[in-house]
Each structure stands twice: as C-alpha cells, then as structure tokens.
C-alpha cells in the first residue's frame, strides 16, 4: 500500500479511572485475549501497510512489552516494520508530547525518511475492522487534502465524547466541533485520517512554529475552510473505549454472536501477541452461560454473561454475573461478583460480595498472593 501508518497511543485518559493507573488505554484487554491496539495494528497489516509507527507516552511499560515483537502482526520484515517511539529529551526538545500534533512533530524525522506518498493516522483505543485501501481510494478520487473517517451514532449514544462534524451533499466537511457541550449532529469522527505525507509534514511544522500542539483543533478545525477536508462514512462496528462504561460495553458486545463472528470468523483476522497456555478447565460443578473464558483459566463456580481473561481462577460456589475479570485474578470460594470490572492480578478474598448497583464498579483489592 502507498501509505505509512501512525498509531497515536500515548494519551492519558482520566475517564478510565483506576483502569489506566497501571497501563495505557491502548493496552487495555479486550475480548478475553486481545489488547485494544491489536485492532489498529491488524487493520494496518491487513491493508498491506509495511511501515507503522506507534507513538506511546503515559504508562507505556505494559504497551511496550506487548509490542516487543512485531512478528505477531506480520511486521517482522527487512523493509519497513513496526516502530515504537516514546518522547525523547534532546538538545532541541525537553518536553513530553503536548498533544497529538506535537507527538507527530517530535517524530517528524520518521516521516521525512519515508517514501510513501500518504499517511494513515489512527488511535490505539478503538475496536474496529477496516480496509484502509478503500479509504485511500476515496481520498484520491475526491482529490482531498484530508479525509476523516466518520460514522453516525445510534440514538441515545453520547456524541459529546467525540468530535462532531457536519458535511454537505458532496461529503465535504463544513463544520467540526471537538467534544462540544451540546451535540448538534450525530455524525462523529472516529479519529482515523488520511493525508498526503508532504502536506502533513508542512502542516505539523507550521503548527509547531506557532506553538500549536493538537491535530484536531489546530489542523482539522483551523483549516476546514482552507483545505479540502472530506468525510468517509462507515457503518460497520466501531467502538472507542474512552470511558469505563464504554470499555465495559465493548467487551460485553463480544458476547453477541454477530459481533464475535464479525471479528473472529470473518476474514481478515485480528492478530495479537500469543501466550502459550493450556485451554480453560471446567471442573465438576462448574456452570458457564453466554461467556468468554480465555485460556489458562480454571472454573469451579458459576459464570454468566461475563468475559474472563487469561489465567482466572474461580473458586468453589463463586457466582460471576455481567462482569469482566481481567488477567490473572484469583477469586476465593463463595464470592459474588455482579456488574463489575475486576482489575488484573487481584485476589478477591473468600466470602466477599461486590455488586455495581449504580453502574459499572471497578474492583481492586490487595493482592495477598505476592505478600512476603
């Protein structure tokens, strides 16, 4: 493909509360065996993009460990490959990334060394499948300066979490508001953009000269009347995990057969780093209904409408309902978990009860397994 990829994975999201105290949003576990960034990386690979840069910053250790080998997404190649960039203090720069445009600016040498004519920019915290070649063909046909991938939200969804845009009959963007207090449209930006590489370099350098650091505010919105910026509307599944509720809903969506089949049975595939573990074990007396249970787990109790990640131990007489249990959690005997997200590497003590009565509850308990 005639494009290089950039995945923005360095942002800090306070709306994820305790879940991002240990990891970046892009490293959040999804659907039992995946990380959020796997979807963007798989889309890049399936679109035959040979060179991809991932820009990381906050709580990047877990994310960097996940990306330590590029072979899982077929980027282990002599030409191109997967590049992971973190903020670097140099003689000319002493700052962390001050925004999305600044993150690209601090790694502009990467783009200048590339030869591909186009750049695809996406975030690492969205769950979706996409062939970027179709978007690029649209971008070229429209003779656009920038193409923004967008979609219509379903009725009742909160549009104020996203950039809101309005387009004319030719799909040219006429108005763009970033996370407004009141949404005047249900068409949102998905945070996926296509732009010519030389033009991106010029816009980023010009923004840096004026101390402007945000790609949406200081480039898209600022130049919407000066540049030909078009929208490319999608209808397939897309979800951004920017809040605890959105993260919970996204994982629960994978309990729906149509969503699960779309991602895991229909080609192209979604790839992730592989961990060699035995299959989940269901001991006598275990009851599992409408749930995803990942490898390495041992089930002795009841699991209903839940997603269990790798190496989860469910004790005797435990009941888990409508919950997400992250990696390497030990649930003692006679525990009751409902409408909760249990953080990874936790020990839930026996004979305890956790219920999210007013929404999704994040459960973090002291991990006594590692106490000396």
Q: Residue spans of the language-model regions?
A:
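Unchanged
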Residues: 1-254, 364-366
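Left-handed beta-helix
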Residues: 1-4, 198, 206-372
């Amino acid at each position: 493909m005639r494009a290089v990829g950039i995945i923005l994975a360095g942002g800090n999201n306070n709306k994820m509360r305790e879940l991002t105290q240990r990891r970046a949003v892009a490293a959040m576990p999804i659907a039992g065996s995946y990380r959020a960034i796997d979807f963007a990386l798989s889309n890049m690979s399936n679109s035959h993009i040979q060179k991809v840069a991932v820009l990381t910053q906050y709580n990047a250790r877990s994310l960097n460990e996940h990306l330590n080998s590029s072979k899982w997404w077929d980027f282990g190649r002599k030409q191109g490959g997967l590049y992971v960039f973190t903020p670097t203090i140099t003689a000319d720069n002493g700052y962390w990334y001050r925004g999305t445009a600044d993150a690209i600016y601090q790694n502009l040498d990467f783009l200048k060394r590339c030869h591909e004519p186009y750049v695809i920019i996406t975030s690492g915290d969205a769950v979706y499948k996409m062939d970027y070649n179709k978007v690029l063909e649209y971008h070229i046909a429209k003779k656009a300066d920038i193409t923004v991938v967008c979609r219509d939200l379903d009725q009742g969804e909160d549009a104020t979490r996203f950039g809101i845009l309005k387009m004319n009959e030719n799909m040219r963007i006429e108005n763009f508001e970033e996370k407004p207090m009141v949404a005047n449209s249900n068409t949102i930006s998905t945070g996926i953009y296509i732009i010519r590489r030389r033009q991106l370099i010029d816009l980023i350098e010009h923004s840096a000269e004026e101390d402007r650091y945000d790609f949406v505010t200081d480039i898209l919105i600022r130049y919407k009347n000066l540049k030909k910026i078009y929208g490319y509307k999608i209808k397939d599944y897309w979800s951004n995990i920017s809040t605890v509720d959105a993260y919970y809903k996204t994982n629960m969506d994978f309990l729906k057969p149509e969503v699960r089949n779309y991602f895991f049975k229909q080609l192209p595939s979604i790839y992730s780093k592989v961990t060699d573990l035995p299959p989940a074990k269901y001991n006598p007396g275990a009851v599992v209904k409408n749930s995803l249970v990942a490898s390495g787990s041992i089930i002795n109790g009841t699991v209903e409408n839940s997603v269990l990640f790798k190496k989860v131990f469910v004790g005797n007489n435990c009941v888990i309902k409508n919950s997400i249990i992250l990696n390497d959690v030990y649930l003692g005997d006679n525990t009751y978990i409902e409408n909760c997200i249990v953080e990874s590497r936790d020990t839930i003590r026996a004979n305890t009860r956790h219920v999210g009565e007013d929404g999704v509850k994040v459960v973090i308990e002291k991990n006594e397994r590692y106490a000396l």
